[in-house]
């Protein structure tokens, strides 16, 4: 269900540097310029970027490394978290969409300890049927059976390179298939009880 404009949207990124290097060039390519009234901070490396549209809607690019209190007080309709935010930042942004009955989207690969709170507080309750308000979409880069790319701009050769780059099955599961992993047992990955254990003497 899409709300009627005007709406306020936050695109939350890990840092301003990531916005300048990665996000802004993509936005520049995809933005329907005819629908834009003004892009505040478009050519600035320090000013917060806000795109104001002709229908009154606004798209704010917000850095997750801002202090939590700087996120307080706003009322927004939709929030996109690009990569996993800290839990306190997520909770603050969640409070921003309450009064509009808005929604949040979190996009990430579960590759480090920073994602454990998402697994414990959101993903596992979703799997157990305790959070009907949550939807989970796995977006693997390739078919795990055929190895064929599921991403239009990746070739089968790209997929094979990724598999070489991440030979560890757990890392591959997280990076290529979006599966939560627990990095346990990696210190002695080749440990075999039959080979490495002896009876007490």
Feature-to-residue mapping (PLM):
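Conserved RecA-like ASCE P-loop NTPase motor core of nucleic-acid helicases/translocases
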Residues: 7-19
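Inter-Walker segment of RecA-like/P-loop motor cores
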Residues: 18-77
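Walker A/P-loop NTP-binding motif
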Residues: 1-5
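SF2 helicase catalytic motif II
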Residues: 75-90
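ATPase catalytic-site recognition across NTP-hydrolyzing enzymes
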Residues: 146-201
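ASCE P-loop NTPase helicase motor core
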Residues: 86-167
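Short catalytic-loop micro-motif centered on adjacent basic/acidic residues
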Residues: 11, 78-81, 106
